[in-house]
Structures are given as structure tokens and as C-alpha cells.
Amino acid sequence: MSQISRTQSIMATTAQEHLETGGRINWLASLNTAFTPARNFRRTSIICTIGPKTNSVEALNKLRDAGLNVARMNFSHGSYEYHQSVIDNVRASVAAHPGRPVAIALDTKGPEIRTGNTAGDVDIPISAGTVMNFTTDEKYATACDTQNMYVDYKNITKVIQPGRVIYVDDGVLAFDVLSIKDDQTVEVRARNNGFISSRKGVNLPNTDVDLPALSEKDKADLRFGVKNNVDMVFASFIRRAQDIKDIRDVLGPEGKQIQIIAKIENRQGLNNFAEILEETDGVMVARGDLGIEIPAAEVFAAQKKMIAMCNIAGKPVICATQMLESMIKNPRPTRAEISDVGNAVTDGADCVMLSGETAKGNYPAESIHEMHEASLKAENTIPYVSHFEEMCTLVKRPVSTVESCAMAAVRASLDLGAGGIIVLSTSGDSARLLSKYRPVCPIFMVTRNPTTSRFSHLYRGVYPFLYPEQKPDFDTVNWQEDVDKRIKWAVTRAIELKTLTAGDTVVVVQGWKGGMGNTNTLRIVRADPDHLGIGQME
């Protein structure tokens, strides 16, 4: 049986098919739309928000079986006791059924602008054409009415201008700014009918606001995350690179391994995206608030631009918000929602995210299943060789030794029709760079670091394997012997999981000695349970 035919039984498409088909258009024209990809090889990770419907070990087991990779906690809601229970339940689920690691993400509330409390805490009716005031006068903080609506952003009169728009309650109500009456009052006119309740969110599109990156609540939440060893922080309403630095300062040395993912949710963040990308560990295209702050039609282009910039930088990117929203109530998604997931995958997103679908929806496991299926199909449409060639032309030279090895490993995997790439990693950086070049085959990352094994779910195509044996004393154990032992273990495990077929060619990426930053060696071995060929070139 040929190498190509063996690999074809495992992978959606083979390297040889990619090489022979040519350009992107010809590749797409030759797609077999009825092809069923291997169910155990999904490159894109799935992030799920954990809520009351799913916060139990039993429910989490079902989500993991359906395809959960990262469990998200939304700190806009819930007490510390509740979030502690989520963390405990996720870890209990993993302990009971080890399998692949599950990462835990803390999503911050972030700096927000909100209205005050209405008088008597009753909904205030608003009619189109109504002229009223938005004010920072504290006497209206608990007594909002149809004439004066309190907002808790003291500098609103300094940053807003006549002709701008103010949105309330996620854009349900829109107000045109007529004038700045004094240093506390903005005069507005309602565009549409509706109601305002207490403490509703306020958006100021196309306006640079000077809110701090972190509220006192956010700082306390981050300290809670450090204490509980969360794997990543989804940082809300990031506007500038300094915001990321401020978060790192709060996380401190104890939280240095926590990955910071910048949520881009406003025009300011979009305008400053290049500097934010340089500072952050990854990005979330948070389309909910972004779709209020900028025209909805522009979000489509912004998504593609940000994902492409992340791909070029080799940093993970998440696409989020309302991806399968209808499944909160319905057992099946709309065709438009499936297309939205597929579009995010083909754009180049490393992860896709579910919010209300798994936090409060009636069909949480089914939502993950649908996202899993949509991602698999979409991944099969990507011309990986074309992507690799373009990435090689875009990389800034000279590159690091580690990145040079990653490029060479992906090239070798394509030329050999390899069934997989095995990378031995401590920090996860080698796996991240391999993911950047999008090989056709899976990337099996072997690490002794539990945190690295979890946050590597951020990288597309990376399968984290947590090696169970402790690091030996290399004064008494030969370094290469330990390397060979880890490679054999990874090959055996990948075959057991049916993500690798016995006899496949495997590209191995390793270091010449222990520690981070020493990756500089490629080896070619054969996956054979009886004779893996370790220790010799084949």
C-alpha cells in the first residue's frame, strides 16, 4: 500500500493531491463536496462558554465527547463561587477521563459605559424623535427618566461630538447627538422607539474614549485567575498596546504563562490593531460589540483583515459571537450559521467560539457537534500548499532557527506525504510556528508542561500530548535516549487515537539539548508499532 493511500485513509486530503492540483481556483473547482473527512482530525479548536446548563461534570463530559477544547468563563456574570465551581468541574472531568487536555479561559468584563438606574426601576419608554439629555450628574444616577438619562462615563462630554451616534442596550436604541450643553450634559434625539431599563450598556461608535484597560473588578478577577492557574485571559475592549502591558503587570510573575488574547470590539482597537498584535499573545475577533461600534457590513472585511494579519504574525486568532445563535432554542442551525463557521475557518481562524449556545442553550452538545462538522468540511476546502508557499514569501528574513526548522518540517511533510509531524516542546513555541505554516497533516506536540499542553489548543492543527513521565536527570540519562522514548510514545498514542496510521512517514522536530529555544533538528521516522525506526534515518 502506498504512502499516499495510507495517509488518505486518515486525512481529509493528501499533500500529493494539493501539490498536483495547482492554484486555489483549480483546487476549489476540483473539490469532492460529498467527501467525509476523518472524524478524529479536526484542526480548528472549539471554545465553549460554560453556563448553568453545562456546569456539571456529567455535562462537561458530554461537551468533551462532542469536541470541546477550551472552557470559557464569562466574568461579566456570576460570582467567584460560581466560577470556582466551573474550574473544579472542568478539572474533575479531565481527571476522570484524561484524553486530550482541556484549557480554561477567563473572559474579563472589561471597561464598560452603562446607564444609571431608572426611577422606580421601571422601563422608560422612548419614542422616535424624543429629545432628551444624557448626563453625568450624579443626582440622576438612580433616578433616570424620559428627560435625563445618567451615564457613568464622566468624560463623555469631552469625547463626543454633534452628529455622532450613541447606542444603548447593544444597539436596540440609537440616539443622534445634537449638542454639548455643558460639561455634564449631551443633548440627543432618539432615532427609534423602544425602552431603556436600568444599567444598560452604552456604545460610542467612531469615538476615541479614554477608559482604563482594567477596572478594579477586572484586576480582582485576574488575580482570581492567577490563583486558579487558568490558561488564558480573553481581555475585553482592548484599545491600545498599553492595555495588554497593563494586564501583564496585574498577572505578574506567577501568571507569566497565562496567554493574553486581545478582544477587538471597537474602532479604536481596529485602528490600533498592528501595535496590539505585536504585544498580545493572540486575538479574538469579537463581532458582537464590534458590529455595534462599526457598520455591520464592515465587520466582514475587518474579520478577514485581522485574521490574515494574525496568520502572517503566527499568532492565534479566535472568531466569536453568534456563530450558531439559533441553536440556543433550535436543534439545528441555519445554513447561514454553518456558512459563518465555515467562512471563519477558511479565513484562517485557529479557533471558533460558542457563547449562549453552550452557556444557556437547550442543545449545547449538539451545537458543538454542528460546529465540529462545519469546521471539518471547511478545512477540506483550504489549499494548504498554496497557503504554505505564500507564508514563506511573506515571512520577514532573517528568521529564527526555530522558525526555519518549522518551515523545513512543513516542507518535508508535504514532499514526503507525511502522516504527521511530531514536535517535542517545552514552551509550545515550536508548535505555534509549525501551525503558522499550516501543514496538511496533524502536528503532535509532546510536552511535559501541563500548561503548555492546554493552551496549545489555541494553535490550529496542534494535537497536544502531555507526556506522563517526569524529566530525568540528564547526568545519568542520555538526552537522545529520552527524546527517542518520547517519540515512540507519541507515535504509539497517535496510532491508538487513529490520527496516524502504522507505516506512515513522520517528521520529527526536536532540540539538540533540553530547554526552551533549542529546536534545531529534523528527523524522518516511520510509524510502525513493532519497529518505529527511531535512532536511524530512513
Curated annotation (Swiss-Prot):
Which reactions fall under this protein's catalytic activity?
pyruvate + ATP = phosphoenolpyruvate + ADP + H(+)
Residues binding substrate: 72, 288-289, 321
The record, for Gene3D superfamilies, names: Phosphoenolpyruvate-binding domains, PK beta-barrel domain-like, Pyruvate kinase, C-terminal domain
Pathway noted in the entry: Carbohydrate degradation; glycolysis; pyruvate from D-glyceraldehyde 3-phosphate: step 5/5
PANTHER family the UniProt entry points to: PYRUVATE KINASE
The subunit field of the Swiss-Prot or TrEMBL record says: Homotetramer.
Q: Which named protein is this?
A: Pyruvate kinase
> Which cofactors go with this protein?
Mg(2+); K(+)
Q: Which InterPro entries match?
A: Pyr_Knase (IPR001697), Pyrv/PenolPyrv_kinase-like_dom (IPR015813), Pyrv_kinase-like_dom_sf (IPR040442), Pyrv_Knase-like_insert_dom_sf (IPR011037), Pyrv_Knase_AS (IPR018209), Pyrv_Knase_brl (IPR015793), Pyrv_Knase_C (IPR015795), Pyrv_Knase_C_sf (IPR036918)
Give the binding site residues for Mg(2+): 265, 289
Positions that bind ATP: 74-77, 114, 200
Q: Which UniProt keywords apply?
A: ATP-binding, Glycolysis, Kinase, Magnesium, Metal-binding, Nucleotide-binding, Phosphoprotein, Potassium, Pyruvate, Transferase
Task: State the Gene Ontology terms under molecular function.
Answer: ATP binding; kinase activity; magnesium ion binding; potassium ion binding; pyruvate kinase activity
Q: Sorted alphabetically, which NCBIfam families does this protein's record hold?
A: PRK05826.1, PRK06354.1, pyruv_kin
The entry marks the following residues as binding K(+), namely 74, 76, 107-108
Q: Which residues make up the annotated site Transition state stabilizer? A: 263
Q: Which domain of life is it from?
A: Eukaryota
Stated EC number for the protein is 2.7.1.40
Family membership: Belongs to the pyruvate kinase family.
- Write one Pfam family the protein is assigned to: PK_C
Modified residues annotated as Phosphoserine in this record: 45
